[in-house]
Regions:
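Positively charged, low-complexity intrinsically disordered leader regions
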Residues: 1-21
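Conserved phosphate-binding/catalytic region of the ribokinase-like
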Residues: 2, 142, 195-307
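Structural motif
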Residues: 3-5, 94, 118-119, 180, ...
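Conserved N-terminal subdomain of the carbohydrate kinase-like
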Residues: 14-20, 42-124, 302-307
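Short catalytic helix/loop segments, enriched in acidic residues and glycine
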Residues: 20-35
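Alpha-helix C-terminal capping segments
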Residues: 34-43, 88, 255-257
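Conserved beta-alpha-beta core of the PfkB/ribokinase-like small-molecule kinase fold
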Residues: 119, 124-199, 219-220
């Protein structure tokens, strides 16, 4: 079976409400998508880095619990595993403070085997942050040469400090190497202020050629491909946005494998097929968003296993 390689930051999210601790869980769209794919019985590996501390153990245990291969997670000894403190106050916007310390040498990971038609998922600030950018992009370029399907999740967590001018070349390089780009409203507002998805696609993505899936939370997903634009409506009442997004992305990848859609097929996929892929992905999203764990139910996972 085709393999799935996920590349992203290993981070622990801790949530506080009105100054009281509420929950702690492994955060990030890439990490939670990897977990969902592992629950589906798909061969998925995580390429990342975390310290040999207790938080790092927690993160690695999370992946292993969800059947994600962790051989490509570098366990460094100098520093600490990153974690984000998310402060939720009634009537106020969430405030996020990021902690953690990486070593001087970054992304010293064991490269996973990548073959033609494998799927590589990457994104967020981890995919553009300068300390590991060069080594990470070498891996992405290798995956593209091997004719894997590359899926890019642009955007980054609220509270991340960055210089947009400095990271924009890396964002555009990621567009260029990708076959599919998936984002939501908050992503483009951060990267391209005062531009809607039409402008973002036409001004920044279309030139490079990837299919663009833009999510408007609670309303629809819009598919951009060449000159075609297709809107697929949905309704989601859950406020578990991380679970919903992870489920949706996992659903898209599941459909690419279930329908035997390969690297050479992406460019020629018709809008009708994309609409079916997205519609099915909504079911995965809804299931992962039902609880607080960001994970799909055992019953749903069993019902959607391939082969």
């Amino acid at each position: 079976m085709r393999k799935i390689i996920t590349i992203g930051e290993s981070i622990l999210d801790t949530v506080y409400h009105n100054h009281q601790p509420v929950s702690a869980f492994v955060g990030g769209r890439v990490s939670n998508t990897a977990a969902a794919l592992g629950d589906l019985g798909l061969p998925v590996s995580m390429v990342s880095e975390c310290c040999t501390d207790k938080v790092g153990d927690w993160v690695v245990d999370f992946f292993e619990k969800h059947n994600v291969d962790t051989k490509s997670i570098d366990r460094y000894t100098d520093g600490s595993t990153p974690f984000a403190a998310i402060f939720k106050e009634d009537g106020e916007q969430d405030m996020i403070v990021n902690y953690g310390e990486y070593p001087a040498t970054r992304f010293n990971v064991i490269w996973p085997r990548i073959d033609e038609d494998d799927i590589v998922l990457f994104g967020s600030y981890y995919a553009i942050d300068q300390p590991q950018r060069e080594r990470l992009y070498d891996l992405l370029s290798y995956a593209a040469e091997r004719k894997a399907i590359l899926i890019y999740l642009p955007g980054f967590q609220h509270g991340t400090q960055f210089n947009l001018t400095k990271v924009m070349p890396s964002i555009l390089e990621n567009f260029e190497v990708s076959n599919i780009v998936i984002d939501h409203a908050n992503d483009i507002n951060t990267m391209f202020p005062n531009q809607d998805s039409d402008k973002v696609y036409n001004n920044h993505i279309k030139f490079y050629g990837p299919t663009y899936l833009h999510i408007t939370p609670g309303t629809s997903a819009t598919i951009y491909k060449g000159v075609d634009k297709t809107e697929v409506p949905f309704s989601c009442e859950s406020d578990n946005h991380l679970g919903w997004q992870a489920g949706f992305i996992a659903g898209v990848i599941h459909q690419l494998i279930a329908r035997d859609i390969k690297h050479g097929d992406i460019e020629f996929m018709e809008s009708g097929v994309w609409s079916e892929v997205v519609t099915n992905a909504f079911d995965f999203a809804a299931n992962c968003a039902e609880g607080d764990s960001n994970a799909m139910s055992d019953e749903f996972a069993q019902a959607h296993k391939i082969g």
